[in-house]
């Protein structure tokens, strides 16, 4: 009303005159006006093809159907796009935050100066693999789990895929013991599958990243990989980031299988690991590769290789 024009004076009433006649303070008017502005104020532009309520329902359904736990809003945004639902990452983040759907984040801590430049990923597959192990409790006791996690190097192309490039799990194995023989098993699996044989020099040009565990620095382990033509690439001492690709895969494995499911026997564990490897390689998506799966990254790179004469 303060902006309306008086018919007698042909002038606006003004806020001061209106509040005096109404018997209220101008501060009260400003406070209520500010509240209405907040209610009306929304992000400019169209809302999109789907309302917030419907989009939250789609996000919940994706989380329920996903074989993995702890995927963040970026991967959920990518999976929405795969399903034909177009929206922005910021909107997905806002809705997941408002409804308590964000993945749990662990706070980091300072560990002093780093002994490496922080980059261990490669540009092509089958240039570097990483290997590591973790322990698992079963009904038979504590089983040792080993898994080889592949990677690749700059400009060096091979016919097969491995981890530090594609993040593909190339070998996985479970056993009662974690000795030098058992820890070599996932590497043997990967060599047979990716290089087609287990022979002298068959994997020449490949590097294997591992820690300084007694199994990996043993004479038997080093002799076997040297026979295959694989170059040993040990990580820095007390620098787990140096074997970060393998460490990250173990975390994914724990969060999605080992910590959420009991196992009666080692054979049951082994079968579950093989199934997880297949699911992971086919459905886990990697942000740095444009939200492609490890299998898609490998297929794309194989398609770029020149045909043999």
Predicted regions and their residues:
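Charged DNA-binding/catalytic regions of mobile-element recombinases
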Residues: 1-309
């Amino acid at each position: 009303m303060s902006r309306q024009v008086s018919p007698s004076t042909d002038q606006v009433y003004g806020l001061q005159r209106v509040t005096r006649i109404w018997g209220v303070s101008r501060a009260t008017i400003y406070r209520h006006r500010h509240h209405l502005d907040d209610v009306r104020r929304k992000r400019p532009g169209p809302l999109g093809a789907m309302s917030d309520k419907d989009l939250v329902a789609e996000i919940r359904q994706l989380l329920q159907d996903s074989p993995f736990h702890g995927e963040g809003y970026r991967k959920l945004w990518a999976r929405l796009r795969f399903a034909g639902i177009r929206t922005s990452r910021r909107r997905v983040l806002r809705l997941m935050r408002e409804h308590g759907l964000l993945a749990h984040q662990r706070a980091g801590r300072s560990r002093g100066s780093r002994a490496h430049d922080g980059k261990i990923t490669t540009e092509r597959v089958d240039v570097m693999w990483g290997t590591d192990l973790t322990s698992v409790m079963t009904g038979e006791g504590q089983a040792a789990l080993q898994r080889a996690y592949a990677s690749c190097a700059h400009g060096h192309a091979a016919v097969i895929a491995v981890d530090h490039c594609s993040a593909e799990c190339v070998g996985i194995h479970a056993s009662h013991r974690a000795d030098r023989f058992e820890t070599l098993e996932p590497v043997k699996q990967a060599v047979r599958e990716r290089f087609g044989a287990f022979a002298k020099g068959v994997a020449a040009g490949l590097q294997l990243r591992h820690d300084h565990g007694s199994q990996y620095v043993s004479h038997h382990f080093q002799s076997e990989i040297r026979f295959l033509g694989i170059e040993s690439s040990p990580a820095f001492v007390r620098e787990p980031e140096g074997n970060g690709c393998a460490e990250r895969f173990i975390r994914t494995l724990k969060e999605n299988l080992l910590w959420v499911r009991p196992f009666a026997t080692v054979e049951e564990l082994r079968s579950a690991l093989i199934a997880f490897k297949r699911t992971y390689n086919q459905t886990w998506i990697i942000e740095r590769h444009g939200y492609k799966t490890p299998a898609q990254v490998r297929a794309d790179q194989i398609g770029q290789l020149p045909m043999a004469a």
